[in-house]
């Protein structure tokens, strides 16, 4: 906000959830309301570099040495086979739980339908999952109807310019059309005429007209490279993978649940999902589902959890120990970070005798 203005000059005050009886007043609005009024900075936090750090620490490897062309890694985006488990054991047809950008139910459904087989296909998936009106009612229908496959739908904004140039349109016009489509402004009648004159398929033109926002390919590439690296560890050094995931993003990891075995974890997931359908589950419980799915996957892969040990457990790190995962003090429900750190400090001063 410029120094000479107040935020209230741009955001009329409102009550949360438009409740006039609330005593709280906020200036929080959807960013689209202010999109053309003030500059918005997207300062996003990323935990991937932190996960890299722990992967290297727990495995004594370098994440940058992971190859981008391992066929087994790509198989993970199509089935559970690389994990050595059946779909029934983890309640999922593919093995991407815990893989950033590819581990949500939405993106997993896309993977199942699109069946990506290469890095380029995964770029398409990443672009489709981050765009607006690009997948649902658009690329998804084209794939379902057999009109084209994942390799040929419009996945990232760069595709439009490159495709149009390949069809023979002038570079400058191809760029202009890409910019208009990616911003949701569609096509002019003149552009449509030019595209048809160069034999651009009708389905492609129709797809362009539906798009509201498109993801850039370079951004998608960064996400896919991270996903490939993490998928490699998940397959080949699973203990390091799970320890890193739980350490960096525990998402309510509860030792009292994890230590009760696979069936109890499965029952807990089903209970939360059932209550969430009835709008009875808390946001904290819902956010813990992704962690519970990984815990269940550990059990399916015969990876054990070791109980909290006063001498061996870390305050917050999940540690590899003889092919198993040693739980930290922070995984105890109700034990805060400071209390966990204090236990470690006391242990370092002198051993516990009782």
Per-segment meaning from a language model:
Residues 1-354:
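Noncatalytic, beta-rich nucleic-acid-contacting surfaces in large DNA/RNA-processing enzymes
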């Amino acid at each position: 906000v410029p120094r000479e203005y107040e935020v209230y000059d741009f955001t009329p005050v409102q009550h949360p959830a438009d409740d006039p009886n609330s005593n709280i007043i906020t200036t929080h609005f959807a960013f689209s309301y202010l999109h053309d009024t003030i500059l918005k900075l997207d300062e996003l936090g990323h935990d991937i570099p932190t996960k890299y750090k722990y992967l290297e620490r727990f495995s004594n490897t370098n994440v940058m040495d992971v190859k981008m062309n391992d066929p087994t890694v790509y198989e993970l985006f199509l089935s559970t086979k690389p994990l050595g488990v059946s779909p029934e054991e983890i309640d999922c047809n593919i093995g991407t739980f815990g893989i950033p950008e590819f581990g949500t139910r939405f993106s997993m459904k896309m993977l199942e339908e699109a069946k990506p087989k290469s890095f380029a296909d995964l770029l398409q998936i990443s672009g489709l999952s981050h765009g607006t009106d690009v997948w649902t009612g658009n690329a998804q229908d084209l794939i379902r109807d057999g009109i084209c496959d994942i390799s040929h739908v419009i996945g990232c904004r760069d595709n439009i310019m490159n495709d149009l140039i390949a069809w023979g349109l002038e570079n400058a016009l191809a760029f202009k059309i890409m910019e208009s489509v990616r911003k949701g402004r569609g096509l002019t009648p003149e552009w449509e005429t030019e595209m048809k004159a160069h034999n651009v398929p009708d389905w492609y033109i129709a797809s362009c007209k539906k798009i509201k926002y498109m993801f850039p390919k370079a951004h998608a590439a960064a996400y896919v490279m991270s996903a490939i690296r993490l998928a490699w560890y998940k397959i080949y050094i699973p203990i390091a993978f799970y320890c890193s995931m739980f350490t960096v993003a525990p998402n309510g990891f509860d030792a009292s649940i994890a230590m009760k075995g696979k069936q109890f974890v499965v029952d807990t997931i089903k209970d939360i999902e059932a209550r969430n359908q009835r709008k009875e589950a808390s946001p904290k419980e819902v956010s813990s589902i992704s962690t519970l799915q990984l815990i269940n996957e550990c059990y399916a892969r015969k990876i054990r959890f070791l109980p909290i040990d006063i001498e061996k457990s870390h305050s917050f790190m999940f540690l590899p120990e003889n092919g198993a995962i040693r739980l930290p003090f922070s995984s105890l429900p109700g034990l805060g970070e400071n209390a966990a750190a204090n236990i470690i400090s006391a242990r370092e001063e002198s051993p516990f005798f009782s």
